[in-house]
A protein has these predicted regions:
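Conserved C-terminal guanine-recognition region of P-loop GTPase G domains, centered on the G4
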Residues: 1-18
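C-terminal lobe/tail of nucleotide-utilizing enzymes
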Residues: 16-125
Length: 125
């Protein structure tokens, strides 16, 4: 759970800046509500922590089909709601972080690949 992980990272490692990506939400409104609720709790119990909203990934049936096929949803169903959200996330991260290249860790590697796909697609349009 995001709150538990944030507590560990803040209290044990001094990390104060976080991005929240709401996953498996009904829509953007629900994603923002998750962010607002978490922000209120964090502001109350973890002073000095900053959470930015990175967006949301909505639940859609095509996402599950991609998982079943063992293919990234963005490849097999590029126009699905979740694929559009992944592209929006990649654009957000590119704008936020410029052209920094992740150098370590599996999550950084995944995000780098996701951002590269988004760059290639935006150039093709």
């Amino acid at each position: 759970d995001a709150y538990a992980l944030m507590k560990v990272l803040f209290f044990n490692h001094g990390i104060k800046d976080f991005l929240l990506l709401s996953n498996m939400v009904r829509d953007e409104s629900q994603g923002r509500k998750v962010y607002e609720n978490l922000s209120r709790v964090v502001a109350k119990f973890m002073r000095g922590v900053c959470i930015d909203y990175a967006g949301c990934i909505p639940w859609d049936g095509l996402l599950q089909k991609g998982v079943s096929r063992r293919e990234p949803v963005i490849c097999c169903y590029p126009e699905s709601p979740s694929s559009r959200s992944f592209r929006a996330l990649a654009s957000f991260l590119i704008k936020r972080n410029g052209e920094q290249k992740p150098t370590d860790g599996n999550i950084k590697f995944f995000l780098k690949r996701l951002m590269d796909v988004a760059k290639d697609e935006s150039r093709a349009q």
